Structure formats: C-alpha cells, structure tokens
Amino acid sequence: WVTKQHKQYAQVLDVTRAAELRQVVQHADAIHIGAAVTLTDAFAALTAQWPQLHRFATRFAGLPVRNSGTLGGNVANGSPIGDSMPLLIALRAQVVLASQARGERQLPLEDLYTGYRQNVMKPDELLVRIVVPRPSAHEQLRAYKISKRFDDDISAVCLVLNLDIA
C-alpha cells in the first residue's frame, strides 16, 4: 500500500529474506506459520490438516499473488476484503508480535484489529508468526467464498464455520 498512498520512507524492512519468518513449524498442539511464508505454502500446511479447505485455498487470490504474497502480510494489512482473516479466526488462530524492546506477545487474531486497516501493533512491533491450533476430533470446518468471478476476485461473501460437535 506504500505505492498507492505515494508515501516515502527513510527505511523499508523486507521480511521475506528472514529465514525464521519463512518457516512452517509443526508442533504437537499447533502449526506455527511464519509471517513471511507464502500464501501457497501456508495453505498447503492448513489443507494438510483440513483437506476440506482445498477448494477455498485455490480460490484465494490469483496464483501469482498466492506464490508471492505472504500470510503475515495479508493478516497485518487488515483489509476487510481479506479472506484469510475469517478462516484464521474460525480456526482460533493467534498472532505473535515481536518487539526488540519488549519481546514477544501473543493474542487472538480477532483482537489484532481496531478498525479499518488499523491494528494494535506498536510502531516497533513486527508480526512474526500465526499460531493455528490443530483440529479437534469433533471439529467440523467449512469455508465458502462467493464472488462475481470464480478466479482471482474479491469475495462478496466469505463464510467460515467451525463447529465442535461433541
């Protein structure tokens, strides 16, 4: 969005070369997706746990965007038309923010946003990873995207349901 607003900055941080931010780490209780992991790789990790997300994942943006855009960028951007946020919120995802001065803090994704393209991140904080709990045995997840065109279109409606049927 820097180019759309014609802003100029003294420094710009490119997180895509930070190896720590490009990792998907599988833990027993959760998947940790680095902020610089491409959308393609992030959705591959998610569909490995939730195969029913495959169709939703292939409708997320166009292939060039999925191969170069990052999940952290999509989440931090906070656009209300972003399809990753409803999915990640339904999956009970948490975001990890890091500051050199204060260390890391973790919060539910829905608590990140305060308004249109606004969030609680401090000027010295960086979104470093998204933590997605593994599915429960009784979980039923469904994701739907309705748009005018099938390929590469913003959602008119994005609906994600995650029910724990015990």
Enumerate the language-model features and the residues they cover.
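C-terminal structural segment of proteins
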Residues: W1-A166
